[in-house]
Amino acid sequence: MTEYNANSIRAKILRRKILQLIAENYVLSASLISHTLLLSYATVLRHLRILNDEGYIELYKQGRTLYAKIRDNAKQIQILNSELEGFKNVSGKPILTKDETPKEFGKKDSLTQRG
């Protein structure tokens, strides 16, 4: 079984966002991805290289500009999506909902009550 920590989960979620952005536009430059996601160019480049090594995207240069495009391998993208679905429930649900607020929060301390 694969173990995940908070950083690896965030990295996978970020790579999924990058993949979605590229898929919506078919081809994007690394600098445009950086600007769109408000990330440093170095961070985007590191994640693009990982996605390239894993076979999700293809990187190529035109002049001094680095571009990324989605490879035609829907199976690997489906595997990534299924892995991330497991994290959805963990990160998407608030710790306490309005109805689950502990009753102690609503009570006044005996020292603050006057009467």
Curated annotation (Swiss-Prot):
Residues 1-91 form the HTH arsR-type domain. Keywords: DNA-binding, Transcription, Transcription regulation. One of its GO terms (molecular function) is DNA binding. Gene3D superfamilies: Winged helix-like DNA-binding domain superfamily/Winged helix DNA-binding domain. Residues 30-53 bind DNA. Pfam families: HTH_24. InterPro entries: ArsR-like_HTH (IPR011991), HTH_ArsR_DNA-bd_dom (IPR001845), WH-like_DNA-bd_sf (IPR036388), WH_DNA-bd_sf (IPR036390). This is Uncharacterized HTH-type transcriptional regulator B-115. It comes from Sulfolobus spindle-shape virus 1 (SSV1).
